[in-house]
Amino acid sequence: MHAFCVGQYLEPDQEGVTIPDLGSLSSPLIDTERNLGLLLGLHASYLAMSTPLSPVEIECAKWLQSSIFSGGLQTSQIHYSYNEEKDEDHCSSPGGTPASKSRLCSHRRALGDHSQAFLQAIADNNIQDHNVKDFLCQIERYCRQCHLTTPIMFPPEHPVEEVGRLLLCCLLKHEDLGHVALSLVHAGALGIEQVKHRTLPKSVVDVCRVVYQAKCSLIKTHQEQGRSYKEVCAPVIERLRFLFNELRPAVCNDLSIMSKFKLLSSLPHWRRIAQKIIREPRKKRVPKKPESTDDEEKIGNEESDLEEACILPHSPINVDKRPIAIKSPKDKWQPLLSTVTGVHKYKWLKQNVQGLYPQSPLLSTIAEFALKEEPVDVEKRKCLLKQLERAEVRLEGIDTILKLYLVSKNFLLPSVPYAMFCGWQRLIPEGIDIGEPLTDCLKDVDLIPPFNRMLLEVTFGKLYAWAVQNIRNVLVDASAKFKELGIQPVPLQTITNENPSGPSLGTIPQAHFLLVMLSMLTLQHSANNLDLLLNSGTLALAQTALRLIGPSCDSVEEDMNASAQGASATVLEETRKETAPVQLPVSGPELAAMMKIGTRVMRGVDWKWGDQDRPPPGLGRVIGELGEDGWIRVQWDTGSTNSYRMGKEGNYDLKLAELPAPAQPSAEDSDTEDDSEAEQTERNIHPTAMMFTSTINLLQTLCLSAGVHAEIMQSEATKTLCGLLQMLVYREQHRSWCTLGFVQSIALTLQVCGTLSSLQWITLLMKVVEGHAPFTATSLQRQILAVHLLQAVLPSWDKTERARDMKCLMEKLFDFLGSLLTMCSSDVPLLRESTLRRRRVCPQASLTATHSSTLAEEVVALLHTLHSLTQWNGLINKYINSQLRSITHSFAGRPSKGAQLEDYFPDSENPEVGGLMAVLAVVGGIDGRLCLGGQVVHDDFGEVTMTRITLKGKITVQFSDMRTCHVCPLNQLKPLPAVAFNVNNLPFTEPMLSVWAQLVNLAGSKLEKHKIKKSTKQAFAGQVDLDLLRCQQLKLYILKAGRALFSHQDKLRQILSQPAVQETGTVHTDDGAVVSPDLGDMSPEGPQPPMILLQQLLASATQPSPVKAIFDKQELEERMSRCCFWRRRTTKLEQILLFIRRMNSVCEKENTNATASN
């Protein structure tokens, strides 16, 4: 080109052509497309919500909710009319078929057997049919034998007899007993003698009895009202025809299949992958198919991925319904009958053939509906048709959203599906709240035919399965991208809109689409939808999302410290000392300095201005600052103003009229405590934080829904969910949402309780209950919640299946309770802190239950619950009796001469002490004071729960019906008595009566006769005698355990009538003198009968008490419990201090020796 240029050639710029990013462009057409997607999503959502409840449905709600209408209408067509004048009903179908014939044909098509035609012939009194005549003869013969005949005999055409036949047909149809009636007339075909059919099946007998009662009721109505039989029976016949001709049976195969067939059930995700891997090598070994077939199979597999995750023909009844091999076509019923009566796994078939399970409530409900003076008008039919119409509109809505996505996936912008699904969930950018989306696809359509229900559930299941698949795709792409770029999740608290801290899951391009998918799944799901979601890997996807989001805090310890700040496990005596009120200055510069503008004042000590402040009470308000000359200006309530001396010449004319406003109380002393979660909703609105909240809400929703529907869910789905909860609690990742209290809230059914009480769960919960140092208020809360969870799930255990586990767990609980009562290791940190704070060895007394006693009371309540259950009662009784017999062995092994009370108890270092104390504590209780987590009574609020104790001794209580907490002083609360031990569940055999008699004997022993033994183990002055302490503690628990006998008066009378065990023969005093025993059995008249236990208790009770008679029983019991727990804690601390002193003395000796050698 240079050769053809004229002049100087200018080189062009080397800049490339800039191609704009299509994703960042916007135009009116693009906005229109998004808005149309939003509107179409809203339209589909309104269709899915369908029509609201009509006034007619609300009016007829009583009968629509009864068991009669549970099958719905016989027809599944919407275009159904009812001629009210001619009392005819029909479906708008082509052709002119009469109503009766169309009904009969539809019944035959619906049921697919001959029972409906047989029942229809009975209702029409077609005695020309041999089967009908034979059946009616058998019924009449049986009614005569059992005296179920009416006093008046009516001809077959009489209205009363017509009512009887129609009611008989209705009961047989709605109880699904038509096949039973047919079996009675096919005795020849079955090869069974006619004699055996004289005794009808129990289900048919119950039907005959209801029919007889209905006939008697009609006769009575005719006699009382004086109307003709035709007038009395006409409305009854109308209602019975409605039940027979228009309603589907309440108990039928269709409904049974619906309940047994897991429509949306699917295998767990990992099992499907494993089966797919196993099938691949097998496909390689089989002969290769033609290419066209392979291509079709490939396309079919790709298209059926969603269907495979949604629908799987997995039903527990498939195994039962295998075709039975028939030996001979002539004798086809005999092998069937032998199979039914011989094999237990064909229980469902035996029920269908023999009708073994009649439903008495349904029989009475049908009879009540037929005889009730209420016409079956067209409104009830309209109610049932309204539900059919609502179901079709809802199906149209879900079909619309699925078709819209398929169109938008291939032809529309990527942002259009987001707008469309926002409309589906009614999330509009601006405007008023238009309500919540549909939560249950079967809402208000319970009475539609089974096929329509299945169609609705399957279609909605496709939408949920599609949402799970999209979430999986987004998370897999995000995980691969983060791994490629080396992005590590950061703590969620460091991510804000001002400081994004780099890329995160909430900032990826698909984040908004992921949020809307999570929101779509956060609903109250039914059992079938839960099976689909849990087995499709939804829980794993949620865990992946949380991993990509990052931890919610820097460390678990910070969370622990934050939650434990300002909390205590008990109320110490020192925290209840109230500070003296500050005396306000009467005069002086301090008083003048407190007078600010607006302060209310009155005349003071130096007042000399007459009645300027009148009329009484003479109050005013400061309106000017105090001047340097010592004058201040005041406006009185009368309106006059003047200046007064406040420091001038040393005079003070005014004083304060009211106390100054006190300082604002701290957060822990406020009167109310609301949830802090509501305050954090607007604190962090970063997309990643929103993603975290949405994921947590999805997990909580799935857990709560599973707790409600676990009885009809797949066991694999329930195990998957409970396995995730167990893993979170084990790794201590549950503090944000999966707390032990939340896990307890879903333990509602036997299925969930059985899964939550597996060996892994029990081991984990016992580890939490036993706890570990440091023992804080937060750790005590976790221990209490773990005990409550055990109390919720352990009643589901079956003794035949888990007898060994029950015995091991019961022994572990008693051992742990014994260690708590003997060691009190969890109270040592509290004692040490109090000691170091006060610089003295004597600790402060606890006004509420301590850490150890609170936990011990919870374990005792758990054992009380288990002891009331049949499967646990025998094990616990056996353990209690074995421990109580140790007292008997002590009596038998020690001489009565010169024996003291503590001689009958095991040594303090004996392991038997813990077991004995645990058993006595279970029978008699431990500590009746206020405790954390316990139920208390407030004067104004009633029964509340203690949830927190502040460091200043204030107690936070929570209502059971709301989340608002209140802070109350200790003196406003009273403990609610716990559930007492039920002595009636103990076996009082003759050997155990003697054991209890010896316990009562120890409880009533005379304390002044026992000499306190000086321990030789005391290392320094002031150390507690462990033997004496243990003796006093056991004596206290024996006294409490004896009170449990008050509710068993007959056994208590037998125990108190037994002879008392004499304590001593002679008692030696310190100076060597001998004191004769006070046996009371020697008199001038001769020997008297031996003393019984009742006399011994009376003698002990009338002794002079060393305690003043100003304390009631409750105060004495609290002082004794406090003394025992305080002494045990003191003993533990003394051992620690003794060890420290010994170590210090050893170190001092070594230092002295080293100095001397140098």
From Swiss-Prot:
Q: Which domain of life is it from?
A: Eukaryota
* GO-annotated molecular function: metal ion binding; ubiquitin protein ligase activity
Q: GO BP, one example? A: protein ubiquitination
Fetch the Gene3D superfamilies from UniProt: SH3 Domains (2.30.30.40)
Region (Disordered), start-end ranges: 281-302, 662-684
Q: Which residues form the MIB/HERC2 domain?
A: 587-660
Q: InterPro entries of this UniProt entry?
A: Mib_Herc2, Mib_Herc2_sf
Question: Which residue stretches, if any, does this entry annotate as coiled coil?
Answer: none
State the organism of origin.
Homo sapiens
Protein name, as recorded: Putative HERC2-like protein 3
Q: Which PROSITE patterns match?
A: MIB_HERC2 (PS51416)
Q: Name one GO cellular component term.
A: cytoplasm
Query: What's a Pfam family in this record?
Result: MIB_HERC2
Q: Where is the composition biased (Acidic residues)?
A: 293-302, 668-679
